[in-house]
């Protein structure tokens, strides 16, 4: 059964300690998790997709294993890039940011990413930011200079604890913009003084706007408290963003800010020479989520992301997306065969048990959960999903009792739901492939298949072959089987 009784206890690779550690929440049974969201000045890209899919699965697993999770994921809706883009387009910041917030939600829905419990916007939390900055100034770890307010990193003894960067070494090798207002080149801004043509808010230090780092500290502590369980994001945020968050929050509260820091690896793009390179607009290898969704179902992108361990670098290429689609096709083929026999597939809502049929490996679900408990090892979990699909195919080929077939199908649905995979109707999966909108409509395909079936019944093999070839030219693949002809798009 997929529930907390089968969990052997979660271990998490904690960036703070640089090792796997048993997960022990601060409050038994309850978990608070904050993940840094997107800066909404453009459409989200495949790197954003990885962060959101990874932490969506982590959230699902925490809930399935019995934890009462509060998941917070923010929007940065005030930032230098946002201001620049709004000015370029001659539109308000609110119009720009809301457009990309809406687009983000559409992209996430296509990827099967469930909404976070709380999705705060930075601009709606200015009072909390100002209060935190004021406390830091009162404690002597922040100072005002030239209309700005800065954090004095030398006054926080544990600066560098997350990234492992020693402050003296950073100063010696730092390539930072010269700012005469700073007491130390590594000091970072908490409040930016007002500039012409930029949004601004009144504050005790004059009109201006918040720095980037203070936003997450203020929102995290508001919704999860001065100390909480998990903080996550991409590896690129370890320094300086998350390092600065720790300095701000602990400098303000005097308490340990976060127990477990989780960071996913980078996304690299495989070039024509087969070499991995950093994804960037300048290299012309930049892919937005919606660009990819025009070519592949969102579930393909999700499977592709989860088929690598979240801490490993993720190599991106279209051939790898094709391999991901082929993997999902294998699972849906097994489910389609079961559906043809049973008439209807059993569903498994999250949280409900998924039973292992008699005679099957009784430890399959336990091993699946062990993989997920072991630092959220989704590639290994997917391997067990394939094992279940293999067992379903075997049960069908050996003409097992329909109850056994139904149980295996239910198990696949249950494991898949845990990962956000294999939840679609298998017929719809195969009929809504790439190019479905531009190609033959389903009704036309069904009509041609009916004509072909009549030709086959009349032993008119030439007509049967002609219809098959016509459909093949439209990217439609036919499979003749015991239960009739099934079709899918290439």
Curated annotation (Swiss-Prot):
<dbReference type="InterPro" id="IPR024909">
    <property type="entry name" value="Cys-tRNA/MSH_ligase"/>
</dbReference>
<dbReference type="GO" id="GO:0004817">
    <property type="term" value="F:cysteine-tRNA ligase activity"/>
</dbReference>
<dbReference type="GO" id="GO:0005829">
    <property type="term" value="C:cytosol"/>
</dbReference>
<dbReference type="Pfam" id="PF01406">
    <property type="entry name" value="tRNA-synt_1e"/>
</dbReference>
<dbReference type="InterPro" id="IPR014729">
    <property type="entry name" value="Rossmann-like_a/b/a_fold"/>
</dbReference>
<feature type="short sequence motif" description="'KMSKS' region">
    <location>
        <begin position="278"/>
        <end position="282"/>
    </location>
</feature>
<feature type="binding site">
    <location>
        <position position="245"/>
    </location>
    <ligand>
        <name>Zn(2+)</name>
    </ligand>
</feature>
<dbReference type="InterPro" id="IPR056411">
    <property type="entry name" value="CysS_C"/>
</dbReference>
<dbReference type="InterPro" id="IPR015273">
    <property type="entry name" value="Cys-tRNA-synt_Ia_DALR"/>
</dbReference>
<keyword id="KW-0648">Protein biosynthesis</keyword>
<comment type="subunit">
    <text>Monomer.</text>
</comment>
<feature type="binding site">
    <location>
        <position position="281"/>
    </location>
    <ligand>
        <name>ATP</name>
    </ligand>
</feature>
<keyword id="KW-0479">Metal-binding</keyword>
<feature type="binding site">
    <location>
        <position position="216"/>
    </location>
    <ligand>
        <name>Zn(2+)</name>
    </ligand>
</feature>
<protein>
    <recommendedName>
        <fullName>Cysteine--tRNA ligase</fullName>
        <ecNumber>6.1.1.16</ecNumber>
    </recommendedName>
</protein>
<dbReference type="Pfam" id="PF09190">
    <property type="entry name" value="DALR_2"/>
</dbReference>
<feature type="binding site">
    <location>
        <position position="241"/>
    </location>
    <ligand>
        <name>Zn(2+)</name>
    </ligand>
</feature>
<comment type="similarity">
    <text>Belongs to the class-I aminoacyl-tRNA synthetase family.</text>
</comment>
<keyword id="KW-0547">Nucleotide-binding</keyword>
<keyword id="KW-0067">ATP-binding</keyword>
<dbReference type="GO" id="GO:0005524">
    <property type="term" value="F:ATP binding"/>
</dbReference>
<keyword id="KW-0436">Ligase</keyword>
<dbReference type="GO" id="GO:0008270">
    <property type="term" value="F:zinc ion binding"/>
</dbReference>
<dbReference type="GO" id="GO:0006423">
    <property type="term" value="P:cysteinyl-tRNA aminoacylation"/>
</dbReference>
<keyword id="KW-0862">Zinc</keyword>
<keyword id="KW-0963">Cytoplasm</keyword>
<feature type="short sequence motif" description="'HIGH' region">
    <location>
        <begin position="38"/>
        <end position="48"/>
    </location>
</feature>
<feature type="binding site">
    <location>
        <position position="36"/>
    </location>
    <ligand>
        <name>Zn(2+)</name>
    </ligand>
</feature>
<dbReference type="InterPro" id="IPR032678">
    <property type="entry name" value="tRNA-synt_1_cat_dom"/>
</dbReference>
<dbReference type="InterPro" id="IPR015803">
    <property type="entry name" value="Cys-tRNA-ligase"/>
</dbReference>
<dbReference type="Pfam" id="PF23493">
    <property type="entry name" value="CysS_C"/>
</dbReference>
<dbReference type="InterPro" id="IPR009080">
    <property type="entry name" value="tRNAsynth_Ia_anticodon-bd"/>
</dbReference>
<keyword id="KW-0030">Aminoacyl-tRNA synthetase</keyword>
């Amino acid at each position: 059964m997929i529930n907390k009784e089968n969990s052997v206890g979660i271990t998490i690779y904690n960036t703070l300690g640089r090792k796997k550690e048993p997960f022990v929440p601060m409050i038994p049974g309850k978990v608070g998790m904050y993940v840094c969201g997107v800066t909404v000045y453009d459409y989200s890209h495949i790197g954003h997709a990885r962060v959101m899919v990874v932490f969506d699965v982590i959230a699902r697993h925490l809930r399935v294993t019995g934890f009462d999770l509060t998941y917070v994921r923010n929007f940065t809706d005030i930032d230098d890039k946002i201001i620049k883009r709004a000015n370029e387009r001659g539109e308000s910041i609110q119009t720009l940011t809301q457009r990309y917030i809406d687009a983000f939600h559409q992209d996430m829905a296509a990827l099967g990413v469930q909404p976070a419990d709380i999705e705060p916007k930075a601009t709606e939390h200015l009072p909390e930011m100002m209060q935190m900055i004021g406390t830091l100034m009162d404690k002597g770890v922040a100072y005002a200079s030239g209309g700005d307010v800065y954090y004095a990193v030398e006054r926080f003894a544990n600066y560098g604890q997350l990234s492992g960067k020693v402050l003296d070494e950073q100063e010696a090798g730092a390539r930072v913009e010269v700012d005469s207002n700073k007491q130390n080149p590594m000091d970072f801004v908490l409040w930016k003084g007002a500039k012409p043509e930029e949004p601004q808010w009144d504050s005790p230090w004059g009109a201006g706007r918040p720095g980037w780092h203070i936003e997450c500290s203020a929102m995290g502590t508001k919704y999860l408290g001065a100390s909480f369980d998990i903080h996550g994001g991409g590896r690129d945020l370890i320094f300086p963003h998350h390092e600065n968050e720790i300095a701000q929050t602990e400098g303000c509260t005097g308490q340990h800010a976060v127990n477990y820091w989780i960071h996913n690896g980078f996304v690299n793009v495989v070039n024509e020479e087969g070499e991995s390179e950093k994804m960037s607009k300048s290299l012309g290898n930049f892919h937005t989520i919606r660009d990819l969704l025009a070519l592949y179902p969102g579930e393909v992108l999700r499977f592709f992301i989860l088929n690598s361990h979240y801490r490993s670098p993720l190599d991106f290429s279209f051939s790898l997306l094709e391999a991901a689609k082929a993997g999902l096709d294998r699972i849906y083929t097994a489910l389609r065969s079961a559906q043809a026999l049973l008439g209807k597939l059993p569903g498994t809502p999250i949280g409900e048990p998924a039973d292992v049929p008699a005679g099957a490996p009784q430890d399959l679900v336990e091993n699946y959960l062990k993989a997920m408990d072991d630092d959220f090892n989704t590639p290994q979990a997917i391997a067990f999903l394939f094992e279940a699909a293999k067992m379903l195919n075997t049960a069908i080929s050996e003409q097992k009792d329909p109850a056994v077939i139904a149980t295996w199908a239910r198990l696949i649905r249950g494991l898949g739901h845990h990962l956000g995979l294999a939840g679609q109707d298998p017929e719809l999966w195969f009929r809504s492939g790439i190019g479905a909108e531009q190609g033959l409509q389903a009704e036309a395909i069904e009509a041609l298949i009916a004509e072909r079936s009549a030709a086959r019944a009349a032993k008119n093999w030439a007509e049967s072959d002609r219809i098959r070839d016509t459909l093949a030219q439209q990217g439609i693949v036919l499979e003749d089987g015991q239960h009739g002809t099934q079709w899918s798009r290439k």
